[in-house]
C-alpha cells in the first residue's frame, strides 16, 4: 500500500489489520482535505469558505445500532440494560469483513488525542473512507504537534466505512448499520452510516468506560470559565439540542468546550479540540460566535442546504433534517481556552428541555436533588438528533447522555455527588424548553431570559436571592430576578388554563417517580427523598 503524509512508519495501517489498501492519506490538514473532498465530489464549497457535506439517510445518531462486545472483561462492568451486546466471535467476523471491504480502497487516517489533560489523555487513531470525515474528526478532537506524530502509537482505533453494510445474521447486529465497540481490543467499527457524529461519540463512549476507574468523572456537558480567577468554572449538562453549545458560548466568559469534559482531582478538562454546533435557524444576531464559524475556511457543515448558484447557506431550511450541524476547531471561537482546562467548577447547570412546559426556568438544587436529577436526566429529545425523530419527545436520559454511558448510571452519579460535596458547588436546574403550555400550545423559553438567569447564577448573586419551594417538584425557585418578568418564574402563571397546568404537572411528577424506581436500590435515602412526590409528602 502507498502511504502519503506524516505518520509512524513502524506502527501504520498494518497494525490495525489492514492489507492491500490502495493508499492511506495520513494526517492531512484542512487545505489538502478540502482538495480531496471536493475532487471526489464528497462535498461542496459554501460562500465564506466552509465545506458542506450530506449524510444520506442517516442524519443523526443510530443508538439502536450501537453494540458492545460482551466478554470476560466487560461482563460485570457494562450496564447491559442500556447497551446492546455482541459476542467476541461476532465482532471478530465483523472486523475481518471490515478489513476485506477496505481492500483496494484509499483511506484517510488521523492521529489525534481525546482529553486535554495529559494525565488522562487517550491517543485515538481514526481511519475514514471519506476525506470530509477526516477533516471533521480532525476539527473535533485534539490535534497533536507535528513533532509527536513520528512516534505516535494509538491507545484506541476507529474504522469508519459508510459504504460497508452489516449483515444482522452474520454480525449479530440489528440492521445494515452498525457501531460496534470492543473495549478489550480498543477498537470501534462504524459501518452503514455517513453521519460524522458517530465518530466523536465513539471516542466519548470509550472515555466514559475507562475514566471512572481512574477517579475521573466523564460528563456529557459544555463548560466555560470566568475571565477572572474568582469567578470559577461552570459545567452545563444537557442532551443534544438543549442549549449546551449556545449557552456556554458567552463572550463574557472563556469557553472550554461544548460537549464532553472530565472532572478530576485537578479540575475540569475538555475531551475535545472542537465544537459540533446545531445550525438550524442559526442567526448572526442571536449566536454571533457560532455564526461566524460558518463563514470560515476549515469548518465542516453537515446537511446544511446551500443555494445552488450563490452557495449561501440557508440555516432555516430543514428539508434534509432539523439536525443540521457545523464542526469547527475551538480556536475559531475568540474566547476559547487555549488549554482546554480549568479549576474546579463553582456552578453546575443541568439543562432540561421540558416538553410539558410546567418546570420553572431555573431552580436551585441541593446535593441530593442534583444527584436525583442527574440520574433522572429529564429532557425532551429534539427533532433530528436521532434517526426517525421528527418532533420533541419527553424522555429520561440518565446522566444527560444515556446512549454514551457504558457503565451503570450510579457509577457516574456517585462520582458527581462526591465531587459536588468536596468542592461545595452550587447546582441549578434550567429549563430551556417550553413555557405557557407544552409543545403545540406554549412557546420556547426566550433565550434572553435563560441568559439573564444564568448570568445571575454564575456571578453568585442568584444564590443570595429569596426562594420559594416549588409545590410540584420540591426544589427552590427564585421569587424574583432583576431583568426577568416575575410571572415567568412561576410556570402556572404563564398558563391560560390553570386546571390543565395542574393535571400536566401531576402527570410529569408521576413520570419522574416511575422512572426513578430503577435507581432506588443504587442510591442513599436522601437521594430517594429528593424526588417530586417524596418532597411533596414531606412538606
From Swiss-Prot:
UniProt-listed SUPFAM superfamilies: PEP carboxykinase N-terminal domain (SSF68923), PEP carboxykinase-like (SSF53795)
Subcellular location: Cytoplasm
Biological or metabolic pathway of the protein: Carbohydrate biosynthesis; gluconeogenesis
EC number: 4.1.1.49
GO molecular function: ATP binding; metal ion binding; phosphoenolpyruvate carboxykinase (ATP) activity
Cofactor: Mn(2+)
PANTHER family named in the record: PHOSPHOENOLPYRUVATE CARBOXYKINASE (ATP) (PTHR30031:SF0), PHOSPHOENOLPYRUVATE CARBOXYKINASE ATP (PTHR30031)
Family listed: Belongs to the phosphoenolpyruvate carboxykinase (ATP) family.
Name under which the protein is recorded: Phosphoenolpyruvate carboxykinase (ATP)
Amino acid at each position: 500500500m502507498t502511504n502519503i503524509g506524516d505518520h509512524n512508519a513502524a506502527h501504520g495501517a498494518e497494525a490495525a489489520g489492514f492489507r492491500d489498501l490502495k493508499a492511506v492519506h495520513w494526517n492531512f490538514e484542512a487545505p489538502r482535505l478540502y482538495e480531496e473532498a471536493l475532487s471526489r465530489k464528497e462535498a461542496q464549497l459554501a460562500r465564506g469558505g466552509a465545506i458542506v457535506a450530506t449524510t444520506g439517510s442517516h442524519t443523526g445518531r443510530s443508538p439502536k445500532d450501537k453494540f458492545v462486545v460482551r466478554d470476560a472483561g466487560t461482563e460485570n462492568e457494562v450496564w447491559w440494560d442500556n447497551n446492546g451486546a455482541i459476542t467476541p466471535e461476532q465482532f471478530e467476523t465483523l472486523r475481518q469483513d471490515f478489513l476485506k471491504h477496505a481492500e483496494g480502497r484509499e483511506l484517510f487516517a488521523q492521529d489525534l488525542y481525546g482529553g486535554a489533560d495529559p494525565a488522562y489523555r487517550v491517543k485515538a487513531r481514526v481511519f475514514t473512507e471519506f476525506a470530509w470525515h477526516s477533516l471533521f474528526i480532525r476539527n473535533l478532537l485534539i490535534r497533536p504537534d507535528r513533532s509527536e506524530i513520528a512516534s505516535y502509537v494509538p491507545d484506541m482505533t476507529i474504522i469508519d466505512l459508510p459504504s460497508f453494510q452489516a449483515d444482522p445474521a452474520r454480525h449479530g447486529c440489528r440492521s445494515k448499520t452498525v457501531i460496534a465497540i470492543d473495549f478489550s481490543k480498543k477498537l470501534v467499527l462504524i459501518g452503514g452510516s455517513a453521519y460524522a457524529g458517530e465518530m466523536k461519540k465513539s471516542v466519548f463512549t470509550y472515555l466514559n468506560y475507562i475514566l471512572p476507574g481512574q477517579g475521573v468523572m466523564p460528563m456529557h456537558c459544555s463548560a466555560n470559565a470566568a475571565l477572572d480567577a474568582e469567578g470559577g468554572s461552570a459545567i452545563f449538562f444537557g442532551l443534544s439540542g438543549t442549549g449546551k453549545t449556545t449557552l456556554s458560548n458567552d463572550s463574557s466568559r472563556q469557553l472550554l468546550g461544548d460537549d464532553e469534559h472530565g472532572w478530576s482531582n485537578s479540575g475540569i478538562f475538555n475531551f475535545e479540540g472542537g465544537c459540533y454546533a446545531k445550525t438550524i435557524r442559526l442567526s448572526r444576531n442571536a449566536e454571533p460566535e457560532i455564526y461566524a464559524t460558518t463563514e470560515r475556511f476549515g469548518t465542516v457543515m453537515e446537511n446544511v442546504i446551500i443555494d445552488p448558484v450563490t452557495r449561501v447557506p440557508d440555516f432555516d431550511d430543514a428539508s434534509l433534517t432539523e439536525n443540521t450541524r457545523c464542526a469547527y476547531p475551538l480556536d475559531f471561537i475568540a474566547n476559547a481556552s487555549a488549554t482546554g482546562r480549568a479549576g474546579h467548577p463553582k456552578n453546575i447547570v443541568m439543562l432540561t428541555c421540558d416538553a410539558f412546559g410546567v418546570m420553572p426556568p431555573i431552580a436551585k438544587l441541593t446535593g441530593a436533588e442534583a444527584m436525583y436529577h442527574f440520574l433522572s436526566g429529564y429532557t425532551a429529545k429534539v427533532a433530528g438528533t436521532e434517526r426517525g425523530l421528527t418532533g420533541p419527545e419527553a424522555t429520561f436520559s440518565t446522566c444527560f447522555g444515556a446512549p454514551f454511558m457504558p457503565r451503570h448510571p450510579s457509577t457516574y452519579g456517585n462520582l458527581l455527588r462526591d465531587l459536588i460535596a468536596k468542592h461545595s458547588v452550587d447546582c441549578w436546574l434550567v429549563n430551556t424548553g417550553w413555557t405557557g403550555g407544552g409543545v403545540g400550545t406554549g412557546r420556547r423559553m426566550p433565550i434572553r431570559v435563560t441568559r439573564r438567569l444564568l448570568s445571575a447564577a454564575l456571578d453568585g448573586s442568584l444564590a443570595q436571592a429569596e426562594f420559594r419551594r416549588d409545590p410540584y417538584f420540591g426544589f427552590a425557585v427564585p421569587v424574583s430576578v432583576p431583568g426577568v418578568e416575575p410571572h415567568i418564574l412561576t410556570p402556572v402563571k404563564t398558563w391560560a388554563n390553570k386546571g390543565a397546568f395542574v393535571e400536566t404537572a401531576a402527570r410529569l411528577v408521576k413520570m419522574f417517580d416511575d422512572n426513578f424506581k430503577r435507581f432506588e436500590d443504587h442510591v442513599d435515602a436522601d437521594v430517594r427523598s429528593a424526588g417530586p412526590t417524596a418532597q411533596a409528602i414531606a412538606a
